[in-house]
């Protein structure tokens, strides 16, 4: 089973801008279909409207306007996977700082592991993968690190 993180946010951003930002920030290669590839990971991202909006995201207190899925190759080395997870975390921080709004990163679609909004970026203190990742752990001293609400669990 592949490792997967889902990111949703309420920022008004079009699909092309979202994909370009992700690709530039993580150093990925965007293919003609919009999928962003990086060794050991690929990302799909799009603005959502109407029936494409995930109503469950409203449990976080805002309406989903875009979504992205980060899928990690299960055949990649642990070092590659950890580096890609760090790139993902840095990209979310950069997006929050540049575009603002609210967002949440879910592990396998239901466990909130990172959130951002008016109060800044917050890492889930219950998610040990953050502190065990040498590239992410330093971020835990720069940003809030506390238990996050888990309305989907």
List each language-model region with its residue ranges.
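Acidic, proline/glycine-rich low-complexity IDRs
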Residues: 94-153
């Amino acid at each position: 089973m592949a490792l997967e993180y889902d990111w949703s946010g309420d920022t008004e951003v079009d699909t092309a801008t979202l994909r370009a930002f992700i690709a530039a920030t993580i150093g990925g290669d965007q293919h003609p279909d919009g999928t962003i590839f990086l060794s050991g990971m690929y990302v799909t991202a799009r603005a959502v409207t109407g029936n494409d909006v995930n109503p469950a995201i409203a449990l976080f207190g805002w309406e989903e306007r875009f979504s992205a899925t980060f899928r990690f190759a299960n055949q990649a080395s642990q070092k590659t996977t950890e580096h890609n997870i760090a790139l993902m975390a840095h990209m979310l921080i950069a997006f929050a700082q540049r575009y603002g709004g609210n967002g949440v990163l879910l592990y396998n679609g239901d466990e909130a592991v990172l959130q951002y909004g008016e109060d800044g970026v917050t890492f889930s203190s219950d998610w040990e993968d953050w502190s065990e990742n040498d590239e992410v752990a330093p971020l835990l001293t720069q940003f809030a690190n506390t238990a996050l609400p888990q309305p989907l669990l």
